[in-house]
From Swiss-Prot:
Subunit-structure text: Heterodimer of LeuC and LeuD.
Keyword RNA-binding on entry: no
Domain of life: Bacteria
Protein's recorded name: 3-isopropylmalate dehydratase small subunit
GO BP field: L-leucine biosynthetic process
InterPro entries in UniProt: 3-IsopropMal_deHydase_ssu (IPR004431), Aconitase/3IPM_dehydase_swvl (IPR015928), AconitaseA/IPMdHydase_ssu_swvl (IPR000573), IPMI_Swivel (IPR033940), LeuD (IPR050075)
Amino acid sequence: MQKFIIHKGIACPLEYANIDTDQIIPKQFLLAVSKQGFGKHLFHDLRYLDDKESVLNMDFNLNKKEYQNSSILVSFENFGSGSSREHAPWALVDYGIRAIIAPSFADIFKNNALGNGLLTIELAKDEVLEIVDELKKSQDKNIEISLLEKRVFFKDKIFSFDLDDFHRICLLEGLDNIALTLKHEAQIKAYEKNSKSFLV
């Protein structure tokens, strides 16, 4: 998992509330079990005008020239609602999204996202609206995020956010659940060696 310490990138506003996991990655693309290859299907029904993904919907912000190569999304309430599919953060990460800023996230999506290296940042609704408004009228779409400081830097404004220590450390060190377990492999083996065996 890629470390997240400081990231600066183009931010794209998605002015929708309740973006659900089926909108993020529709069910017909869930056959694969690898984390790679989902990015091209991200927001399929919003990004494309046809099922073959050959005609782009140019009214959708991610398809607009000024938001190409976006690595940060700024959206509205309850991002990631719906089913618990882990493919949703896989698709976002595979597309190149490193962070999402919103007033709130669905709990399961948030945990899945953080576990896959995708930073979820909760800001007050008025702060999100301020960022969205500035993104739409400014030529400079770049936002800087410091996970070390737990701050978002945009123009001359600084927005502070919170994140629990466990997920913050995992992101700073680039540790997913497997890597975190392996980090404590010696302690686990020592515990197993010193523990009594019981027949079940």
